[in-house]
Amino acid sequence: GILDFAKTVVGGIRNALGI
């Protein structure tokens, strides 16, 4: 659902920032 999508987006952003 929307919340799962949001979690995925946030996880991707955090992953990118953690390079």
From Swiss-Prot:
* Keyword set, alphabetical order: Amphibian defense peptide, Antibiotic, Antimicrobial, Secreted
Instruction: List localization entries.
Output: Secreted
Q: Where is the major localization of this protein?
A: secreted
A single GO CC term, please?
extracellular region
Q: Which InterPro entries match?
A: Aurein_antimicrobial_peptide
Keyword Secreted appears in the UniProt entry: yes
Function field = Shows a weak antibacterial activity against B.cereus, E.coli, L.mesenteriodes, L.innocua, M.luteus, P.haemolytica, S.aureus and S.uberis.
Which GO biological process annotations does it have? defense response to bacterium
Tissue specificity here reads:
Expressed by the skin dorsal glands.
Protein's name in the database: Uperin-2.4
The record's Pfam families line, in alphabetical order, gives: Antimicrobial20
| UniProt superkingdom | Eukaryota
Q: Organism, per UniProt?
A: Uperoleia inundata
User: In its keyword annotation, does this UniProt entry include Secreted?
Assistant: yes
